[in-house]
């Protein structure tokens, strides 16, 4: 019986910020309000210095969404990820 009655899809989209010192993270509430979003995680706090993305540890967060299909879940996760904005100071050391 395990798994019976389950159908649909899920998707994770990682959040990649611009290079610079993190000033603020905005739009998390908007991202969480997207239909099908199960969670939004932000891994970094203001003051963190982002370099270019080289490894998974350089990511700033992630979004998990579900839907009736893999494509729907991915579209929802992408829409939520687009709502999250990382304000950075590109000139800070």
Where are these regions (language model features)?
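Peripheral (often C-terminal) accessory segments that flank ATP-dependent C-N-forming ligase machineries
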Residues: 1-93
């Amino acid at each position: 019986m395990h798994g019976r009655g389950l159908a649909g899809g899920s998707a994770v989209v990682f959040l990649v910020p611009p290079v610079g010192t993190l000033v603020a993270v905005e739009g998390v509430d908007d991202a969480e309000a997207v239909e099908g979003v199960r969670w939004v995680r932000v891994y970094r706090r203001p003051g963190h210095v982002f370099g270019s993305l080289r490894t998974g540890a350089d990511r700033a967060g992630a979004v998990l969404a579900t839907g009736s299909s893999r494509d729907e879940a991915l579209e929802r996760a992408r829409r939520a990820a687009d709502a999250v904005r990382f304000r950075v100071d590109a000139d800070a050391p």
